[in-house]
Regions:
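Short pre-active-site segment immediately N-terminal to the catalytic Zn-binding motif
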Residues: 166-182, 263
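Amphipathic alpha-helical transducer elements in NTP-driven molecular machines
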Residues: 117-121, 177, 181, 272, ...
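Post-HExxH zinc-binding segment in Zn-dependent metallohydrolases
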Residues: 196, 203-235, 279
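Cytosolic-facing loops and C-terminal tails of multi-pass membrane proteins
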Residues: 2-25, 226-268, 273-277, 281, ...
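Secretory-pathway/luminal and periplasmic proteins that interact with or process carbohydrate-rich
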Residues: 148-149, 211-218, 299-305
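Catalytic Zn2+-binding segment of zinc metalloproteases
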Residues: 185-204
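Hydrophobic or amphipathic, alpha-helical segments that drive membrane association/targeting
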Residues: 1-154, 161, 238, 242-253, ...
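An active-site-proximal "capping" alpha-helix that borders the catalytic cofactor pocket
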Residues: 125-129, 185, 193, 208-211, ...
Length: 357
């Protein structure tokens, strides 16, 4: 498959490409990894149940703490009996709340209309047809140096072909049409893998959920910090114990998160490698390294553009055209910065915990 550059981008596609063969062993491996990722949240739930059982056991079996105590010792005995139960209850609460709390809202995107952008929609349909992937129901724009194809309604679209394509405007502004076509072929290459993409969605969802549980903080964390500063030493001790329990619990979850990441990394790299093959087949193997370099440069320029935006925001101003600012920043990158990025790319080797080859 080749992409030339005639008058119409739709005429640029000539020939066809051979679908990348996904070995049966690889698909079976993805299933095993997905099963392991599903088991990790069950370990999380088991931790909640175990902590609940310990609190119940303490309340039922440690009533002797309150027997044969008099005077001021009653206060100490009460704290020794009630304190662990309160601390354990708070610990359980902090483990349960992530099951029901929603994550941070995704950055807003702009939905395109096929009636207003027929050429772009036809361009995407052409790529999907060549790659052998389902056509997305929606195309959206954002300001990232990236493109992504995913389930439009998350889990509700899991068993169908209800997809959404998100194209970053800096990507479109800073790349050639051939390069953009290659990037889109990479994204749709994931969905050409069928079951593999769904296994991957399970894996990434579980990994993302664990990361959110471990690192996100909310107003309950702030309240616990405040309670741990209580003036009464007894109350302070209870909430410090609870705070310590929450810290230990998050460390356990951190271990589960990294276990899931380690389990899934090899399969993730293989999926990305297969998707890369679609990009190389559609845009050309000679264009692939140029696209990768362009992505690195635009990503660095995006960081500089966001710093510019932050500075202007201090004066209650914002850039009029962020994609153009990113492209300008890329064009004016110092030679030393370009060389540094290129050297880093050539010298970096794939590590065991990398998700991309």
């Amino acid at each position: 498959m080749t992409v030339s550059t005639p008058d119409s981008p739709l005429d640029a596609f000539t020939g066809s490409i051979t679908p990348t063969r996904v070995p049966l062993l690889y698909q079976a491996g993805l299933g095993v990894v997905a099963l392991a990722m599903v088991l990790l949240p069950l370990v999380y739930i088991a931790l909640i149940v175990a902590m609940g059982w310990l609190v119940w056991w303490h309340l039922v079996n440690d009533t002797g703490i309150m027997e044969n105590v008099h005077g001021r010792a009653i206060v100490l005995a009460l704290l020794a009996y009630i304190g662990p139960a309160v601390a354990g209850g708070i610990f359980i609460l902090f483990l349960i709340k992530p099951l029901f709390s929603r994550g941070l809202k995704a950055a807003p995107t702009f939905k395109l209309s096929e009636a207003e952008e027929p050429l772009l929609f036809d361009f995407v349909k052409k790529i999907c047809g060549v790659v052998g992937a389902p056509v997305p129901r929606e195309i959206r724009l954002d300001t990232q140096v990236n493109a992504s194809a995913g389930f439009r309604r998350g889990w509700f679209s899991f068993f169908g072909n209800d997809l959404v394509l998100v194209i970053g405007l800096p990507l479109a502004a800073g790349m050639s049409m051939r390069q953009v076509a290659g990037v889109l072929a990479h994204e749709f290459g994931h969905f050409a893998q069928g079951a593999g993409m769904r296994f991957s969605y399970i894996i990434r969802s579980v990994n993302g959920w664990f990361a959110r549980v471990v690192y996100e903080r909310d107003h309950w964390d702030e309240k616990l910090d405040g309670w741990a500063q209580a003036e009464h030493w007894g109350i302070k001790a209870i909430f410090m114990l609870a705070k310590g329990g929450v810290w230990v619990g998050r460390k356990v979850l951190w271990c589960l998160m990294n276990a899931g990441h380690a389990i899934s990394c090899f399969m993730s790299r293989q999926m990305e490698f297969d998707a890369d093959s679609y990009e190389a087949k559609l845009a050309g193997s000679s264009e692939f390294p140029r696209t990768a370099e362009r992505l690195r440069l635009l990503s660095a320029a995006y960081g500089a553009a966001m710093q510019d935006a932050y500075q202007t925001y201090q004066n209650r101003e914002l850039p009029d055209d962020l994609p153009s600012l990113v492209v300008w920043r890329e064009q004016t990158l110092p030679t030393a910065a370009r060389v540094s990025l290129q050297n880093a790319a050539h010298q970096t080797k794939t590590a065991w915990n990398d998700t991309h080859p």
